Amino acid sequence: MRTHFCGLVDETLIGQTVTLAGWTDVARNQGGVCFIDLRDHEGIVQVTVEVDNAEVFAVAASLGYEDVLQVEGVVRARHAVNDKMRTGKVEVIATAITVLNKAAPLPFHAHENPGEETRLKYRYLDLRRPEMQRMQRTRIKLVQALRRHLDEKGFQDIETPILTKATPEGARDFLVPARMHPGEFYALPQSPQLFKQILMVAGFDRYYQIARCFRDEALRADRQLEFTQLDMEFAFVRERDVQDFVEDMIRGIFKEVVNVELDASFPRMTWAEAMRRYGSDKPDLRIALELVDVAELVKNSEFPVFTGPANDADGRVAALRIPGGASLSRKQIDEYAAHAAKYGAKGLAYIKIADNGEVSSPIQKFFSEESFAALVAHVGAGNGDIVFFGAGGYNKVSDFMGALRLKAGKDFGLVADGWAPLWVTDFPMFEWDEEEQRYVALHHPFTAPAVDDIADLRANARTAVSRGYDMVLNGNEIGGGSIRIHRPDMQSAVFELLGIGAEEARAKFGFLLDALNYGAPPHGGIAFGIDRIAALMAGTESIRDVIPFPKTTGAQDLMTDAPSPIVDAQLAEVHIQVRPKTN
């Protein structure tokens, strides 16, 4: 139906007859001549229809937005060059136009940017927009480049099951009733984690998969119910082997896909250092602001909000200096306090130093003149600055002060241009869940501890460090991995520390424990979020922009109207009866 793509018509074709197909982006009838901007996936070319070709002119004059056309014509040089178009030096003089399909009146035009609900309801129209085409192509190029790199490095692309076993220790599973086994269910995989480990036991050495994963969890801009990850696993490796390989891969992929030169070597930072300096296990290093511990300077003050945590081994009192922050009004300071409260803060103390050196602070009265001056000096505050203080449990203070750091960085224009990758390593093995009164795995239950001795792990579970690692880019965790447990006795011990008894472990993970018993090699791996990396490359904050058919934050597909009710006959086939909703 076509000989050339619209966006690729150029001066080399002048004088030649071409056949094009695409959508009417714009049609303009200027009396003696009609101009049609014809669009396909490669771009736009101007089609010109002259009035002396009466039949073709009549068709052109009747066109509307998004009508689908086939155009035959001769390429000629444009009298008025349009430097804003790739095809701006040429036009196609139409000799025939066939309307392949008329478009109904549109809910929005391809060059408009309507609300997100409208975009998702008419996703097929939204995806025609040039910006959406660009972002989807970025994703496509990313996946193609990853596959090519891994194929060249000897990795094997192996599929793992979509219908699998429900397991604990993660987000909520999506469950699928098993028709042939009444009362029993499959689960959609949250990741291929256990299958890729078993592939290492099976001797495949290097595995990868562009895997679809499913987690029934609350949605936000960077999270979806179903998502795509690059899943990788290596046999006979240590942490640095995995990190060096994927660092080189990510550096090459960014250069190939978006022509970005990442650092020749990514910095490494322990989890403890990241939390201490930045209040986050995924710090955005483009923001130069850092947290400063001040417990030693405030522990003998008369301010009980500070003295309690400052004298508690599990407490923290941290300060954040914001250059130029003295310009904040009382209302704006309250907004910062409200932001911190979302992350667990019960209050936010501050010291504000005006440009003329005048100090205002609700906590100054709790300090001697000397100790207050020492506190100001310790945090490096000067004229024009504000310093926020957080006090409480170590992790909670780190969380809300880290959130303030990000907000301040954006509000005060302190986010540097460019890309800031790093590795965060040495994560805690466990964290204590106050609600359930037990340890939970910080990464997942299959992450190896840094110690090989089970007795040591049991005795020091609270402070145990794992062999986990995350790759962070501009404050986004783009990849997470670890060296895995390959000994069945260690895996059983970790299950036990997580409150998973031997009977439960056998019922839910017996296949893994059995596999580890038959000569499992040391192995490790990593998984990268394709959606998140594509969003960063495309320059959008929402992964929904780089997913062709995403769900809303309300977990709905507005285009297909999913989820939707199921008729009783279908429910009966899978032995399910739905209870009526109750208030």
UniProtKB/Swiss-Prot annotation:
Q: Mind listing the GO molecular function terms for this protein?
A: aspartate-tRNA ligase activity; ATP binding; nucleic acid binding
One GO cellular component this record assigns the protein to is:
cytoplasm
The subcellular localization recorded is: Cytoplasm
Binding site residues for L-aspartate: 169, 215, 443, 484
This entry's Enzyme Commission designation comes to: 6.1.1.12
**Chain residue ranges for the region called Aspartate:** 193-196
Alphabetically ordered keywords of this record: Aminoacyl-tRNA synthetase, ATP-binding, Cytoplasm, Ligase, Nucleotide-binding, Protein biosynthesis
Q: Which reaction does it catalyse?
A: tRNA(Asp) + L-aspartate + ATP = L-aspartyl-tRNA(Asp) + AMP + diphosphate
Please name the HAMAP family in this protein's record: Asp_tRNA_synth_type1
What's its job? Catalyzes the attachment of L-aspartate to tRNA(Asp) in a two-step reaction: L-aspartate is first activated by ATP to form Asp-AMP and then transferred to the acceptor end of tRNA(Asp).
Q: Which PANTHER family match?
A: ASPARTATE--TRNA LIGASE, MITOCHONDRIAL, ASPARTYL/LYSYL-TRNA SYNTHETASE
- Summarize the subunit comment: Homodimer.
The record's comment on protein family reads: Belongs to the class-II aminoacyl-tRNA synthetase family. Type 1 subfamily.
Query: Which protein are we looking at?
Result: Aspartate--tRNA ligase
Q: Which gene encodes it?
A: aspS
